[in-house]
Amino acid sequence: MNKVKIGVVGAGIYGNYHIHTYACDPNVEKVVFCDLNDERKKAAEEKYGVKGYSTVKEMVEAEALDAVSVATSDPYHFDPCKDAIEAGVKYLLIEKPMALTVKECEELMELAEKNNVKISVDFHKRWDPAYNCIKDDIKSEDKKIIRGYMSLDDVIAVPEQWFT
């Protein structure tokens, strides 16, 4: 398996999870990131020992990246995705939602197809056993009351033991 070079867009809450997870993955050769906020950029550089850039284009071109993860706030997904595709990245992971409008999503998909870029939108609960159980219950013929409780204390980073 070839090791990959990955760039993360955004050094906020989710961006930090992405940077940390990629930095711990033995299949990742290099991790870099970009963020417009100089304080966040400096903090992430110091915390993870990885290089930070100011723009997506600069990051992708300087590092010849294979993949980019877009982990900015929801309203700011479209432009970095477009910039990454236009800068030559071949794989793009986008935190949900892909974009704010159907038109923006369609534009990204067309641009990706034109440039042979693979896109994935991260719905991190998609594989969660509890969600699959609820989905099965909803589809079930046995109609019963389904109650749910939400917790905001779950860990997002992948345990490092998973890489062995």
Model-derived features with residue positions:
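Beta-loop-alpha module in the N-terminal Rossmann-like domain of NAD(P)-dependent dehydrogenases
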Residues: H18, V50-L111
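Short, well-ordered coil/turn segments that N-cap beta-strands
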Residues: V28, K90, V117-K118
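Rossmann-fold dehydrogenase core element
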Residues: E106-H124, D142-G148
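Acidic-histidine catalytic/liganding microenvironments
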Residues: D25-P26, A62-E63, D128
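Predominantly a Rossmann-like dinucleotide-binding segment in NAD(P)-dependent oxidoreductases
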Residues: K125-T164
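N-terminal Rossmann-like dinucleotide-binding module
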Residues: M1-Y48
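Local beta-strand N-terminus motif with an aromatic residue
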Residues: K30, G49, L65-V68, D142-I145
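Hydrophobic C-terminal alpha-helix "anchor/cap" residues
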Residues: Y22-A23, M59, I138
